Each structure stands twice: as C-alpha cells, then as structure tokens.
C-alpha cells in the first residue's frame, strides 16, 4: 500500500512538472508522437526529395550522364549550403538532409544520386554517426557505409569525392565536443583518407582548412561550433570545386 501511495505521489509530481513546462502537454505529446511516427514511416527520408528528383529525371536523357551535374549528398552541413550562391552557373544538386547518418544516406544513394545521372558526387557524412543520431555506431560501420556508396558510384561510373568530417568547437552556445569527440573526428578522417588513397578516390580535406591552433573549428567560420557560416562555406567552396575537377579528370 505504501508503494502504491509513493507511485501515485510521484505521478502527481511528474504531471505537475509537465503541465508547468507546457501550456498544453497533451498537444505537445501528440506532436512528438506524430514526429516519431513520421520518422518511422520514412526512416531514410526518401520522400524529402522525391518530387524534385522526379522533375529532374523527367528532363534528363534516357541514358548517359547529365553534363556538369554534381550531386552533393550529406547532412545539415550540406542541407544548409546554398550551392547556387557558391557555385554560380553550375548544375549542382543539393541532396543534404539535416541530422542524417551514413546508413540513411546509403539507402538514399540510388534515388537521390544514381538516378539523377550525375557526372560526379560529393559525400560529406559522418558527424551524426559519431553523435549516435540513429543509434550507436562504430568508426568501422561508418567506413563500411561510405565504402558501399563508393562501390555503387564506381559501378555507375560516377566520379566520387568523399569529404572529411569538419572539426567542431566549444566556442558557441553549446559544447559540441561532448557529442562530437574531436579525437573520433580525427580517427574517422584518417580512415576516410586511407580508404580514398587505397581505392583511387579524391579525398576532400575540409578539416585542416577550418581548424584553429587549439584543434577546434575556427570561431570565425561558425556560429554554433558545428555548422559553417557564410565565411566557412566560402572556404569550403573552392576546395570542393578543385576536388570535383580532380575526380572528373581521373575518369576521363
């Protein structure tokens, strides 16, 4: 009886706390539940670009590559990159989705990359793997997913660039190094670079160009210590362009 009374008392306290935090706790709970259900219904978010992909496919030749087309596949860092601003007059396609991990991108690789018949693709991924966005992952698991995408690109004659994971910092409002270990970032980048060398792919080194003397993402390149700002993207754009040219030269 005493246990039941304690449980009831605890339930009342929790209910009061929830009510204080939200003017409409039932609505907030429903919104969270709906969001979780939507994620479960389309875990890799194939629907995000389905309409845009269909439109591009309807305009492209039945066979062969679309001249000059490059697909940028990635997470929020790619998603927030206004490619038309940094690569004017280039038929580059942005297929970044905020929060995504390499297993999600691997599922998206066919509809969002292969089916668009690009000459080249740039993959920037891994930071959310380290954060465990879709569950715990090892560095080997991340490398395996990148390798699978690389093999798909090779089979479909897509010149591939794999980018380093960017550094993070604690200079912003949140300590990004808590979820994104700088040591793990360095280890993952070493693996990516080694894989690219072994398989004749272009490794795009954003990391060293954005790093400060403390081993952090330079403060002037980010407002939150994780995502590049305009100045950060300005550094990244010419590096990406050089890497794309190098990748295309290798397949000619």
Which residues are covered by each model-predicted region?
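N-terminal secretory targeting modules
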Residues: 1-71, 83, 245-252
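Hydrophobic residues at beta-strand termini and immediately following loops
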Residues: 73, 95, 204-206
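Alpha-helical cap/lid subdomain in secreted, periplasmic
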Residues: 85-91, 106-252
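Cell-envelope and extracellular/periplasmic
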Residues: 96-98, 125-126
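Catalytic nucleophile-elbow at a beta strand-turn-alpha helix junction centered on a G-D-S/GDSL motif
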Residues: 67-83, 98-101
């Amino acid at each position: 009886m005493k246990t039941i009374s304690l449980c009831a008392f605890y339930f009342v306290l929790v209910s009061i706390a929830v009510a204080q935090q939200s003017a409409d706790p039932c609505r907030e709970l429903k919104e969270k539940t709906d969001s979780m259900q939507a994620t479960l219904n389309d875990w890799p978010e194939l629907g995000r670009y389905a309409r845009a992909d269909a439109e591009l496919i309807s305009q492209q030749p039945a066979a062969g590559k679309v001249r000059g087309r490059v697909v940028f596949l990635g997470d929020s860092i790619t998603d927030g990159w206004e490619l038309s601003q940094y690569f004017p007059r280039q038929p580059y396609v942005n297929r970044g989705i905020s929060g995504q991990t390499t297993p999600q991108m691997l599922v998206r690789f066919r509809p969002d990359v292969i089916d668009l018949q690009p000459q080249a693709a740039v993959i920037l991924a891994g930071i959310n793997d380290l954060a465990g966005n879709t569950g715990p992952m090892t560095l080997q698991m991340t490398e395996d997913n990148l390798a699978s995408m690389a093999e798909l690109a090779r089979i479909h004659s897509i010149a591939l660039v794999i980018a380093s994971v960017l550094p993070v910092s604690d200079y912003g409002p949140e300590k990004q190094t808590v979820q994104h270990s700088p040591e793990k970032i360095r280890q993952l980048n070493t693996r990516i670079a080694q894989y690219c060398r072994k398989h004749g792919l272009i490794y795009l080194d954003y990391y060293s160009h954005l790093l400060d003397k403390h081993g952090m993402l330079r403060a002037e390149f980010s407002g939150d210590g994780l995502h590049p700002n305009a100045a950060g993207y300005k550094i990244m754009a010419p590096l990406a362009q050089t890497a794309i040219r190098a990748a295309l030269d290798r397949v000619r």
